Amino acid sequence: MLLIPAIDLKDGQCVRLKQGDMDQATIFHEEPAVMARHWVDRGARRLHLVDLNGAFAGKPKNEDAIRAIIEEVGGEIPVQLGGGIRDLNTIERYLDDGLEYVIIGTAAVKNPGFLLEACTAFGGHIIVGLDAKDGKVATDGWSKLTGHEVADLARKFEDYGCESIIYTDIGRDGMLQGINIEATVRLARAVKIPVIASGGLSNLGDIEALCEVEDEGIEGVICGRAIYSGDLDFAAAQTHADRLRESDDA
């Protein structure tokens, strides 16, 4: 089970939001690259970046901070980024800068043809981010709820050739209420590509619950507020997850 620290970027700083509300941002560090180094030193094997300003503006807004993070740790572990990615030129630029994965969310839902083009042009580097509430997909920084069922879109995008799917339960994100295991497993069973869980991770119990269903196709989990607030010790959690996997394999 891959534990992936999230670095959410707003106005060049590392922040956390509650339920995607830009007005409820807590600043955790003014230098995101320093935060990235911290998580790598604590044992992170991948980083998850979100350009929050970009997600709402529909175009990149924190490129300097993103490049600084890539320069700091991109040569050591894969870095993935979502938020404000709406065209192939932006994807190409980010991949050239050293990103390993680009996450397409709203643009994939609103313009599936763009996602197909991206998967065709940059195979192996495109992740789809599906954000949902009560099984329905949300777009535009979670501000708009669509009528699309998560599983239906996931299967469609899998056929396009995306690398994996990040599934975020909007109702739980930033609330430390626990991962929605049932909904995550349901989605993982609907597709053959890996699913990464997101939204609500709160403690070791969540990690253990995810490890129990890892073989359903759940590759990892995004770690947000819990590792910043101290509710979850990231290094200890990743070590614990690795040990659980080793015991299962024994």
From Swiss-Prot:
Keyword list, A-Z: Amino-acid biosynthesis, Cytoplasm, Histidine biosynthesis, Isomerase
Chemical reaction(s) catalysed: 1-(5-phospho-beta-D-ribosyl)-5-[(5-phospho-beta-D-ribosylamino)methylideneamino]imidazole-4-carboxamide = 5-[(5-phospho-1-deoxy-D-ribulos-1-ylimino)methylamino]-1-(5-phospho-beta-D-ribosyl)imidazole-4-carboxamide
Molecular functions (GO terms): 1-(5-phosphoribosyl)-5-[(5-phosphoribosylamino)methylideneamino]imidazole-4-carboxamide isomerase activity
Cytoplasm keyword on record: yes
Gene Ontology BP annotations: L-histidine biosynthetic process; L-tryptophan biosynthetic process
Cellular localization per UniProt: Cytoplasm
Family: Belongs to the HisA/HisF family.
The protein's name: 1-(5-phosphoribosyl)-5-[(5-phosphoribosylamino)methylideneamino] imidazole-4-carboxamide isomerase
